[in-house]
Regions:
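Short hydrophobic "helix-edge" motifs at membrane interfaces and signal-peptide entry regions
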Residues: 4, 16, 76-77, 102-103, ...
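Sec-dependent signal peptide recognition
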Residues: 1-7
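Short hydrophobic/aromatic-rich motifs at helix boundaries and adjacent loops
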Residues: 39-43, 184-187
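N-terminal signal peptide c-region/cleavage motif recognized by signal peptidases
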Residues: 12-14
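Serine-dependent carboxylesterase/thioesterase catalytic core
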Residues: 19-27, 31-32, 36, 42-154
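Helical cap/lid subdomain of alpha/beta-hydrolase-fold lipid enzymes
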Residues: 98-239
């Protein structure tokens, strides 16, 4: 396939040794949740800083101050700094970017970001078990909460949303298509360069070969390929 050939040519070109990718995991997760992406990007020549932080311990503001400075320090001396986030990791980054500038800023891929807040927090946030599991940062993610206060994103941002759910109960709360945790509509944000919906779930999307391929494509080219599929990826890997 022509698409597979194009993707093969793309991946055959190593990233600049001076390109760095900062990764931020989601709520109640850890850096290991992004291990597949981390290892793939490293194989493609990127320097990767997979930041780990205790996502349920503090507010988004405090978490961002703890996670971003050391991650960015690890990228010092590189040509460009890119970002890949999952879920609430995007809100940490948006808060940080609202108050700081990143020298030599590259591209950003947000996976399942609650950019317009979460209807689940609206419905369940007042319940004690929810607060215990998700902490102060989780409580900030209501549809009238912090995400809505942060404004448009910067140039070079691509968003991937999922449309498959592993939680039918949550999906009855979420409006329209959703990934089991975040509605597709809530992932959209003013200023984004691209938005892609894929049949993947919130919890496991970062391990999907197609998602990994789309992340790599966007970091390299600033665009997604909606037609990229498992056949293309298989042909690429077995060529």
């Amino acid at each position: 396939m022509l698409r597979a050939a194009a993707f093969l040519c793309l991946t055959a070109l190593p990233a600049s040794a001076q390109d760095c990718v900062v990764m931020l995991h989601g709520l109640a997760r850890s850096d290991t949740s992004l291990l597949v992406l981390e290892e793939t990007l490293e194989l493609e020549g990127f320097q990767v800083v997979n930041s780990d932080y205790d996502s349920v311990a503090e507010t988004v503001q405090v978490l961002a101050e703890r996670a971003l400075p050391p991650a960015l320090a690890a990228c010092e001396g590189t040509d460009r700094t890119h970002f890949v986030t999952h879920s609430m990791g995007a809100i940490l980054l948006r808060h940080w970017m609202s108050e700081n500038q990143v020298p030599r800023l590259g591209r950003t891929v947000m996976l399942a970001p609650p950019n317009r807040g979460s209807e689940l927090v609206d419905e369940l946030g007042a319940l004690a078990p929810f607060e215990w599991v998700n902490g102060p940062a989780g409580a900030q993610l209501a549809t009238d909460g912090l995400p809505r206060q942060l404004g448009p994103v910067w140039p070079g941002v691509g968003v991937v949303a999922g449309s498959r759910s592993l939680n039918p109960v949550y999906s009855t709360i979420l409006p329209g298509p959703d990934d089991g945790k975040v509605s597709v509509a809530a992932t959209r944000i003013e200023g984004m360069d691209a938005h892609l919906v894929l049949p993947v779930t919130h919890t496991f999307m970062m391990n999907s070969p197609v998602v990994v391929g789309q992340v790599l494509l966007f970091l390299r080219t600033g665009a997604f390929d909606p037609e990229l599929d498992y056949v293309d990826l298989y042909e690429t890997l077995t060529d």
